[in-house]
Amino acid sequence: MKTQHKKQKSKQKTKSNPREEVIQWVKEFVEVPHPMFADYPPCPYAKQARMQGKVDFRELTDMEPDSNIWTSIDHFDFEKKDVLVIIADAKRWTPHYTQKLAAQLNGTYAPRDLLIMEDHPKLIEKVKDVKLNQGRYTLLLVQRRTK
């Protein structure tokens, strides 16, 4: 009986923490110098922004409408913070829809000097052989264009 209980327990999925997984990717890849980028990190500003508390991570739950993305961007204080990272389950949108959504958001927010970049696990972005994607979640990264 005890053996069966242990087997059942090991089969249970541990609840993932999307925010922590994305932060781990930022720390272990985005902020780390890489020879492909002349020994600079893929994003040379990421570590400083994160360490100074200038990055916010917002998880979009399965129950929320897409319109909450606009609400999150509208209420984000880009004077105090540099980047808003919106995290969604990879199955929420197709790669094509993710690109269309980012284009629509860019059309809406370009007059406010904002840039929205999308990252979907199935939209592989590479520089030579270096994959830049987070790989597990769909991300919308929102920041000022001119900063």
List where the protein language model places each region.
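Expand to "…catalyze enediolate/carbanion chemistry for C-C bond making/breaking, isomerization
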Residues: K2, K11-K147
